[in-house]
Structures are given as structure tokens and as C-alpha cells.
């Protein structure tokens, strides 16, 4: 399995896919070509991002697009506190029960942190559902073939007139039992997915992680934390899911960081995509991105207050200039509590600009969601122009000024 994920190519798109004319971005960049987000760091708080996506590899001035990718939900955390040493054959016991064969990458290392996790909980629901369907089809084909063979064997026993009665009875019972068990396996099939072993070790002062689904890890490529290595892996099994690693607690915790859906990549592309074709660029192709996953895969990519606060603290630690949060929901009280207080601190104390979506609960008044309704945030609704109607929504344009789209949430807020 390669340590570097396959680059996902971008399809051709209309130059009007992003409303750069309506927002004044096109005119601004025509006049100030290098004022395109260079030296600006944007924290994208969302489902996480596909690190292999086209247009999100480099900035316009050649820097890495992502400075880091953090899972603020804890959903990808793996307990690697168990420390083991090599046995007489140079192997180590994996948490899966496998006896793991190490490669030359482990030379000179005496002890290893080990842990394990199932693959499926790490994957976005779209990839997980597709793989489960494919694996079920493969299992069903094999199982049906075995059931057909078992039925033929049973039919042959019943038709064999040369067998003594007692012998026929015993063979028939065995064949019927086999057929029953095969049918039961089909009916009770429950695929939990591959079990991954996670091996962590420190070498040359750098923590490194190896993730494998088999006993032979000789050809595995150790991955270091993303911020320093920019290493991206692929889980294989047809998942087409990129991931990076983070190491915490002195090697006792590993975070396998994946996205929980495509929304975060979509947002990151709008903000800062930089493609070979400038027409496919985002608003600020020179900007860098800190990807903070706040969409928890265990909650169908919903966010928690804890995840939001972790992401805001990370944005402060990395020195972000801007925060984008395209999440929101109804609220009983949006101006009190730790989440609101931390957003307020990000603006008033840490000097960041915070942009939050209004929500999609319009067109009624006072439908704006939280945390977009807090006073410190710049709350952004959805607008549509005649050209956007044709290019983005497949509706007939008409000669009228742009307007707020019907689904966009609106104010005023309760305060």
C-alpha cells in the first residue's frame, strides 16, 4: 500500500462555478495579482478534507496548501499505550493477534507501541457503504457457490442406491448440517471490516506510525505526523480514502485522520483551491489551510461542542488569520456557554476573523443558526445571481438583480 495517496483529478467546470465577478474577487485579482491570500492561514472547521484532492496541493507561490490536518472529534484516536519488544524471531505481537513481521524501517528500534482499530469506523459513510456492498456481493457469490455444491452433494447421497441405510443416514445428516450452516452464515452475515494493526515507534527523534491489515509489514512505509512530513496514506481495500497521522501522549495515542465526508474539501476548494487552470481556483489560491475535522463520523458527521473548542484552540496555536465554519443548527441559547465564549475570544482576544454560515432553514425570519448568530462572527447567507442560476442550479436565468436564495436562513437574532 503506498504511503502517498493517489491524486484525485478535477473535472472541467464552468468559469462561473464560483461567483468571483459578483463578489468582486475577479476584479480585485485583476488589479492586485499577488493579493491572493498569500501569507494568510485559514482554519477550515468542517468534515475534514481530502488531502489528495486536485487543486489543494500547493499555493500560488509554491507552498504546501495544508499546514496540518487535525481530528478534533477524537473519532480516529487509537490507544497505543501497550509497549512491546521483539521476540526471538524479531517479530512483535499485534493487538489483532497477528505476529507482525517488521521491515528494515525498524532497524535499531527496541520497543514499539501497539494498538488496533477496525477500518470501517474510520471511513466516510459513502466509502464505507460502497465497500460493504462490494464485499457482501463477493461473499454472497462465494457462499452461493458453496451452497450449490453442498446441495449437489446431498442430492448425490440421496440418489446413491449402493449405500447401506445406516451409512446413507449418517452422510445425509452431515450434508444437511453443512447446508444448514452455509445458509445460516448467509442469513447472519455481518461484516465488521478489516482489522488494522497500528505500530508506533520513535526513531531519530521522530515519532513514526505503521498501519497494516496483515502480518507482513516489511514493505510498509512509516508515516510521521503530517505537519512535518506531509505524508498521506491510503487505506486500500478500494476505499480511495486518504489519511494522515498524528502522535500524542508520548506515543500512547495515535490519531488516524480522515475526512467524514466531502463537504470540507468542497469548502476548502472554495476558499483556497489553486489549480493549473486559474478558472478553477478558489477565492484565495495563495492562502494555506489548517484543516480541523469537527464533523464526527460516529455522529453522521455532526459536530460537538468539545470538537469546536478543540478546533478553535488549534487555530490559535497555529496562528490562523481566519476561521471558516460552514456548520450551524437551531439553539436554545447561543450566546452563553464555552463554545460561544471561545468564539468570542477568537475574535476579541486572539485577533481572528470568524466567518460562519447562516444556515439553510430559510426563508422565514429569525431562522439563523448557531453559532453564526453570535455577535462576534460574520454570518454569511446564500445569495444567487442570474448567471449563477444557469451555471450552478440549472434554472433559467432572468433579467433581475441578485437576491438571497430562498433556503438561506435570515435574521434577526434573538438579541
Language model: regions and residue ranges:
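Active-site neighborhood of phospho(di)ester-bond hydrolases with catalytic His/Asp-centered motifs
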Residues: 45, 324-326, 354-359, 380
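Conserved structured catalytic cores and adjacent interaction surfaces
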Residues: 307, 318-321, 325-326, 353
Amino acid at each position: 500500500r503506498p504511503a502517498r495517496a493517489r491524486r484525485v483529478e478535477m473535472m472541467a467546470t464552468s468559469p462561473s462555478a464560483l461567483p468571483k465577478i459578483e463578489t468582486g474577487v475577479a476584479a480585485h485579482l485583476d488589479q492586485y495579482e499577488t493579493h491572493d491570500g498569500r501569507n494568510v492561514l485559514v482554519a477550515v472547521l468542517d468534515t475534514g478534507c481530502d488531502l489528495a484532492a486536485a487543486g489543494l496541493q500547493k499555493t500560488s507561490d509554491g507552498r504546501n496548501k495544508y499546514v496540518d490536518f487535525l481530528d478534533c472529534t477524537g473519532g480516529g484516536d487509537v490507544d497505543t499505550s501497550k509497549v512491546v519488544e521483539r521476540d526471538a524471531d524479531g517479530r512483535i505481537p499485534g493487538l489483532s493477534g497477528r505476529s507482525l513481521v517488521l521491515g528494515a524501517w525498524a532497524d535499531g528500534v527496541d520497543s514499539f507501541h501497539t494498538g488496533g482499530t477496525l477500518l470501517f469506523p474510520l471511513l466516510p459513510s459513502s466509502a464505507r457503504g460502497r465497500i460493504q456492498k462490494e464485499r457482501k456481493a463477493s461473499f454472497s457469490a462465494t457462499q452461493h457457490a458453496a451452497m450449490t455444491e453442498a446441495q449437489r452433494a446431498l442430492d448425490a447421497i440421496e440418489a446413491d442406491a449402493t449405500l447401506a441405510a445406516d451409512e446413507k443416514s449418517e452422510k445425509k445428516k452431515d450434508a444437511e448440517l453443512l447446508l444448514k450452516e452455509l445458509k445460516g452464515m448467509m442469513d447472519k452475515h455481518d461484516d465488521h471490516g478489516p482489522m488494522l494493526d497500528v505500530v508506533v515507534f520513535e526513531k531519530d527523534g521522530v515519532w513514526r506510525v505503521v498501519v497494516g491489515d496483515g502480518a507482513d509489514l516489511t514493505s510498509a512505509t512509516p508515516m510521521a505526523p503530517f505537519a512535518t512530513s506531509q505524508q498521506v496514506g491510503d487505506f486500500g481495500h478500494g476505499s480511495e480514502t486518504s489519511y494522515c497521522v498524528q502522535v500524542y501522549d508520548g506515543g500512547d495515542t495515535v490519531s488516524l485522520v480522515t475526512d467524514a465526508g466531502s463537504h470540507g474539501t468542497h469548502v476548502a476548494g472554495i476558499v483556497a483551491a489553486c489549480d493549473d487552470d486559474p478558472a478553477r481556483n478558489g477565492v484565495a489560491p495563495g492562502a494555506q489551510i489548517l484543516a480541523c475535522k469537527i464533523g464526527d463520523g460516529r455522529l453522521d458527521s455532526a459536530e460537538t461542542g468539545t470538537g469546536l473548542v478543540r478546533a478553535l484552540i488549534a487555530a490559535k496555536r497555529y496562528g490562523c488569520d481566519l476561521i471558516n465554519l460552514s456548520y450551524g443548527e437551531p439553539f436554545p441559547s447561543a450566546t452563553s456557554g464555552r463554545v460561544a465564549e471561545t468564539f468570542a475570544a477568537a475574535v476579541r482576544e486572539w485577533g481572528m476573523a470568524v466567518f460562519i454560515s447562516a444556515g439553510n432553514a430559510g426563508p422565514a425570519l429569525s431562522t439563523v443558526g448557531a453559532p453564526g448568530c453570535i455577535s462576534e462572527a460574520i454570518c454569511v447567507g446564500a445569495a444567487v445571481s442570474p448567471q449563477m442560476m444557469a451555471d450552478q442550479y440549472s434554472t433559467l436565468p432572468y433579467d433581475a438583480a441578485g437576491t438571497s436564495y430562498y433556503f438561506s436562513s435570515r435574521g434577526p437574532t434573538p438579541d
